[in-house]
């Protein structure tokens, strides 16, 4: 009994230590500059408080839950903390600290879910991952805010002791879409798996209805601005996957955004026999790998999947992304490293290629199985090498 108590106290102290380190690193790193997104959120919040349209006059590309979250955080006041030297020296001062703490708490909740459903190790692979720390503490992007609700919806659906779990899970998935539409195709993936027609209808209608309603009241009077900001204005076509594997004719005659959307739907069909939780992890990887455009903050999206399926390829993905974050202009932007490597935007876009390639290989391994993947890969290598050898043979 004494040994068990000592063991429990040790594990509890270790847990508290890791949680403290995770929060501390996220707050500590926010002192090293800020991202353009934070400046845009400040500007959009000012418009919102003035009663002006964030879609017509601002550069706001999400549904309304995030602007309401920013507004609530702005109203919170802690004078004792606001006047400290550390806070006053941080870009954005206490308002930014509140955002960092809020997003850190979101990360902590995901960590708890991973800890309870898997292990402390898997939870820490997410919570102490440098990608997560930098995106939350420095960049202040809120992708995990949306992913948290999506993850909760999956876990609750798998709990067969909960009544009306299909409805509750669909509501949570709808909230996820409203916060940020990362999982925009996932209701379709889910619907493909359901056997009953009524369940298919629920998992499609409920989430998408919540997503659409989350634009109220702007959707009524400012539909054009909502449509342009959310779906049109910010689109680019520089996705690394399509640059590596897309023939030139694709880039000439097809929209990469359309191809990305079609591919995500097709993958939902292909993974119809996979468990819902597995499909959720695969989706988080696929939405980044096959994206028609790429920003550094996208690289945080598959972190839950990385933690669950952790192997040397995901370690390499983490290392490459962390090194990119040190020099990229949207992230830590360390000048002495940028000067050494003469880093610029073009270098960042080139760096995306090996990162996405590593993630793609890991994705194929997990989705089709390592044995099948390596058997197929060996056949391809053997075929190509035979063709090369036959093409260079000559008679003496």
Report the location of each language-model feature.
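A cyclin-like helical interaction fold
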Residues: 242-249
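Multi-pass membrane glycosyltransferase architecture that uses lipid-linked
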Residues: 2-235, 253-396
């Amino acid at each position: 009994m004494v040994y068990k108590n000592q063991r429990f106290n040790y594990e509890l102290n270790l847990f508290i230590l890791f949680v403290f380190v995770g929060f501390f690193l996220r707050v500590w790193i926010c002192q090293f500059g800020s991202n353009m997104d934070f400046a845009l959120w400040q500007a959009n919040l000012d418009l919102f408080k003035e009663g002006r349209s964030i879609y017509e006059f601002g550069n706001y590309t999400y549904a309304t839950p995030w602007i309401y979250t920013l507004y609530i955080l702005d109203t919170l006041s802690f004078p004792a903390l606001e006047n400290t030297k550390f806070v006053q020296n941080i870009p954005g001062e206490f308002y930014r600290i509140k955002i960092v703490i809020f997003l850190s708490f979101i990360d902590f909740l995901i960590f708890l879910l991973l800890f309870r459903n898997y292990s402390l190790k898997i939870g820490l692979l997410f919570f102490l991952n440098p990608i997560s720390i930098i995106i939350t503490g420095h960049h202040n992007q809120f992708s995990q805010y949306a992913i948290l609700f999506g993850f909760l919806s999956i876990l609750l659906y798998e709990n067969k002791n909960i009544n009306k779990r299909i409805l509750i899970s669909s509501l949570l998935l709808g909230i996820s879409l409203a916060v940020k539409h990362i999982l925009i195709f996932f209701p379709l993936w889910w619907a493909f798996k359901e056997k009953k027609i009524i369940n298919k209808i629920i998992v499609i209608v409920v989430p998408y209805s919540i997503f659409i309603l989350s634009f109220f009241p702007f959707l009524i009077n400012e539909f054009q601005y909502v449509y342009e900001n959310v779906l049109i204005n910010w689109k680019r076509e520089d996705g690394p996957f399509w640059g590596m594997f897309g023939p030139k004719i694709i880039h000439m005659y097809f929209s990469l955004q359309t191809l990305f959307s079609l591919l995500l739907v097709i993958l939902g069909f292909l993974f119809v026999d996979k468990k819902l939780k597995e499909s959720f992890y695969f989706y988080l990887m696929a939405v980044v790998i096959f994206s028609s455009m790429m920003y550094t903050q996208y690289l945080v999206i598959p972190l839950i999947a990385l933690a669950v399926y952790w192997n040397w390829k995901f370690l390499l993905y983490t290392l490459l992304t962390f090194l990119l974050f040190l020099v990229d202009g949207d992230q830590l932007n360390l000048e002495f490293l940028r000067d050494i490597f003469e880093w610029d935007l073009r270098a960042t876009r080139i760096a995306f290629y090996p990162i996405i390639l590593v993630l793609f290989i890991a994705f194929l391994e997990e989705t089709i199985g390592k044995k099948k993947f390596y058997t197929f890969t060996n056949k391809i290598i053997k075929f190509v090498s035979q063709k090369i050898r036959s093409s260079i043979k000559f008679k003496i």
